Amino acid sequence: MVTEAPATNDPRELVVWSALEEIPDPEIPNISVVELGVIRGVAFEPLPGGGERVTVELLPTFVGCPAIGVMREQIEERLRAMKLATEVAVNVSFAEPWTSERISPEGREKLRASGFAPPALTGPSFDGPELQMLLPVAECPYCGSRDTTLENPFGPTLCRAIYHCASCRQPFEQFKTV
């Protein structure tokens, strides 16, 4: 379920999607908000008094994600500068949960190149408190080894865990599979 610009007849929507591809995630600047899969949609709508509003739906990776405010500001600033509409709205949406399956293949490669292990493509098929301890083995983004151990399921942000590679002896973070 990778997020991509949808097929649309409105060329302005494609322009907005292209602009969003240039907005970096505040915590990992090598990956864009589109590659991370946090953009749910883009829409133009007429305003009652004339003019139009462009609305971007933003999905947080986790409830309380500290980067959401920065993402929202970056998107608003960029779209206002483009002057495609009289108003810009960025709505944080909980209509559907963000999952790690929304990260694009390019985004996964950029995570790896930045020293982060991308989340597994498929996660455990159960729920419960044991979930974090039964995460799939993480592949080291530095040497590719799977001889890794989970050091702490609580990384610097809610969406990351800390691992250690026994082969190259490097600590690294993995995006959690959700």
Predicted regions and their residues:
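N-terminal presequence-like segments and adjacent domain-start helices
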Residues: 1-22
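Short edge beta-strands and adjacent turn/loop segments
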Residues: 30-59
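Short, non-transmembrane amphipathic alpha-helical segments
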Residues: 61-86
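Residues immediately within or flanking Cys/His clusters that coordinate Zn2+
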Residues: 137, 145, 162
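Short cysteine-rich clusters marking metal-coordination/redox-active sites
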Residues: 140-143, 165-168
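Short functional micro-motifs and their immediate structural scaffolds
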Residues: 145-149, 173
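Short linker/helix segments within small regulatory modules
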Residues: 152-162
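Short metal-binding segments enriched for Cys and/or His
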Residues: 167-178
